[in-house]
Amino acid sequence: MTSQPLRVGIGGPVGSGKTALTLALCRELRERYNLAVVTNDIYTQEDAQFLVRNEALAPERIIGVETGGCPHTAIREDASINLEAVDQLNRRFPGLELILVESGGDNLSATFSPELSDLTLYVIDVSAGDKIPRKGGPGICKSDLLVINKIDLAPLVGASLEVMDEDARRMRGDKPFVFSNQKTGQGLAEIIAFIERQGLLTAA
């Protein structure tokens, strides 16, 4: 039986840094794994085009899904459009090891269907204020890894990383989280280590 690729869902609100994280992961992992990406946008393929422009992967390894309406539905209640994209990539690239599925920007209640994602990363950003972790919601409380992004902006918006740390621990219990800054690469190594460890990936 052919083994199925690990599917990693990357969710979070609009502008939190999901696409920047997806790009960084592609650049770091494309030499190690047989890798592809599915992106979700409501009415365009902007995120997919951004990844292609920045040469994250070969264009044929990136599929942009236009969800229409609510992006939450396309990753949860009716994930068929995304599942079809995953199947298409599996057919196109036999031996695929890893597929990153980036959701469209959504609210704190968004979660991935277990049919679509084996591991979930949820990205929030400091610029939205240090109260975000304590607001809870499935993404913050139940994702496999919470990524608190854009920590360089904390002084500019008056956000306390200490408060965010305390609240994330309280809301998530034993579930891990990481502070990151995609501009400098801070936190990226921890995110990759988490994906490899939890997804049982072994680099070629």
Swiss-Prot record:
Primary localization class, coarse: cytoplasm
Molecular functions per Gene Ontology: ATP hydrolysis activity; GTP binding; GTPase activity; nickel cation binding
A single cellular component GO annotation: cytoplasm
Gene3D superfamilies, sorted: P-loop containing nucleotide triphosphate hydrolases
InterPro entries cross-referenced by the UniProt entry: AAA+_ATPase, CobW/HypB/UreG_nucleotide-bd, P-loop_NTPase, UreG
GO biological process terms, semicolon-separated: urea catabolic process
Localization annotation: Cytoplasm
Residue numbers binding GTP: 12-19
Superkingdom assignment: Bacteria
Pfam family name, one: cobW
KW Thylakoid (keyword) present: no
UniProt keyword annotations, A-Z: Chaperone, Cytoplasm, GTP-binding, Nickel insertion, Nucleotide-binding
NCBIfam families per the UniProt record, alphabetical: ureG
Family from the record: Belongs to the SIMIBI class G3E GTPase family. UreG subfamily.
Subunit structure: Homodimer. UreD, UreF and UreG form a complex that acts as a GTP-hydrolysis-dependent molecular chaperone, activating the urease apoprotein by helping to assemble the nickel containing metallocenter of UreC. The UreE protein probably delivers the nickel.
Function: Facilitates the functional incorporation of the urease nickel metallocenter. This process requires GTP hydrolysis, probably effectuated by UreG.
UniProt protein name: Urease accessory protein UreG
Originating organism: Pseudomonas paraeruginosa (strain DSM 24068 / PA7)
Encoding gene per record: ureG
